[in-house]
UniProtKB/Swiss-Prot annotation:
Belongs to the RecA family. This is Protein RecA. ATP binds at G72, P73, E74, S75, S76, G77, K78, T79. The keyword Magnesium does not apply. Keywords: ATP-binding, Cytoplasm, DNA damage, DNA recombination, DNA repair, DNA-binding, Nucleotide-binding, SOS response. It comes from Wolbachia sp. subsp. Brugia malayi (strain TRS). GO terms for cellular component: cytosol. Can catalyze the hydrolysis of ATP in the presence of single-stranded DNA, the ATP-dependent uptake of single-stranded DNA by duplex DNA, and the ATP-dependent hybridization of homologous single-stranded DNAs. It interacts with LexA causing its activation and leading to its autocatalytic cleavage. It is found in: Cytoplasm.
């Protein structure tokens, strides 16, 4: 006679409870648990400084407790974006560190982006091993919210530095990163911090079909990252003949916390960074937060100015109004991510406004 399914289920539950008890005795309480004992809450994030990119990431910013890679060509805005993340974390009272492996951090530029350099922890390591050890100590302290490593290509192994100029060191940097990331991944999660690696692009030799571009440091970083951002300069912003900034596009090529492959476009202005005011004007007009009639913009029946630059100047002089408009935009975009019942047409309009 077959056993009662209910009795069989109870026996299996008892066996599982016994196994959990043994695991807790061996490794300590909390080593294993049912998910209902530790319910998953909304992902904690830090803003990137760009409304469009925060929306493209799907959770309102970069997720805490994760490793992030920002890569792209030279002068595309990689370090600028990372410094904006630091500035946003500091606004929330967070502590941040910058591992300047390239020895090229412009402190004055960082201040212009809103970074409090007096409270920024900075290190300029001599070798890749030293850099990863410093990162490990900072992560394990659980005191730092954001750590930026600039850049992966500059994490030179000690053997390469101590060797002669013509020596071959095949795969040495890739092995260094692979070993370091194995140790750092769980520590970053437990510390609930964001570890950002800035990376450069190289060209594969002999590639005829497909994309010849690749990033430095091997494949380990691609696997261990939860978010990978491909940042590109797609145009120039001109004022008559002089260039004032760059039109920038960021593609989320990997995302473990939301749907990937979304894109965000925004302006990076020289000596200013990401033009949040420009985003407020463009996205606000598309979402209907700002009223646009020809070249004139209005908000709550108040005319803001004629032309985009004049409206920017108005927002600079009236920061409370700018913050109010930004809050309404973020509220609309936040609802679009979290609302299951939103009509498909409304969701599409919001995505068109941002992406």
């Amino acid at each position: 006679m077959a056993s009662n399914p209910e009795e069989k289920s109870n026996d299996r539950q008892k066996a599982l409870d016994n196994a959990i008890s043994q695991i807790e005795k061996a490794f300590g309480k909390g080593a294993i648990m049912k998910l209902k004992q530790n319910p998953v809450e909304k992902i904690d994030t830090i803003s990137t400084g760009s409304i469009a990119l925060d929306s493209a990431l799907g959770v309102g910013g970069l997720p805490k407790g994760r490793i992030v890679e920002i890569f792209g060509p030279e002068s595309s805005g990689k370090t600028t974006l990372a410094l904006h993340v630091i500035a946003e974390a500091q606004k929330k009272g967070g502590l941040c560190a910058f591992i300047d492996a390239e020895h090229a951090l412009d402190v004055m530029y960082a201040r212009k982006l809103g970074v409090n350099t007096d409270n920024l922890v900075i290190s300029q390591p001599d070798t890749g091993e030293q850099a990863l050890h410093i990162v490990e100590y900072l992560v394990c302290s659980s005191a730092v919210d954001v750590i930026v490593v600039d850049s992966v290509a500059a994490l030179t192994p000690r053997a390469e530095i101590e060797g002669d100029m013509g020596d071959q060191h095949v795969g040495l940097q890739a092995r260094l990163l692979s070993h370091g990331l194995r140790k750092l991944t769980s520590a970053v999660s437990k510390a609930n911090c964001i570890l950002i690696f800035i990376n450069q692009i190289r060209m594969k030799i002999g590639v005829v079909y497909g994309n010849p571009e690749t990033t430095t440091g091997g494949n380990a970083l691609k696997f261990y990252t939860s978010v990978r951002l491909d940042i590109r300069k797609v145009g120039a912003i001109k004022d008559k003949e002089s260039i004032k900034g760059n039109e920038t596009r960021v593609k989320v090529v990997k995302n473990k916390v939301a749907p990937p492959f979304r894109e965000a476009k925004f302006d990076i202005m020289y000596n200013e960074g990401v033009s949040k005011l420009g985003e407020i004007i463009d996205i606000g007009a598309k979402l209907g937060v700002l009223e646009k009639a020809g070249a004139y913009y209005s908000y709550n029946n108040t005319r803001l100015g004629q032309g985009r630059e004049n409206v920017k100047n108005y927002f600079k002089a009236n920061k409370e109004v700018a913050n109010e408009v930004e809050a309404k935009i973020r509220d609309l975009l936040g609802n679009s991510d979290n609302s299951i019942t939103m009509e498909e047409e409304s969701r599409q309009l919001l995505e068109e406004a941002v992406f």
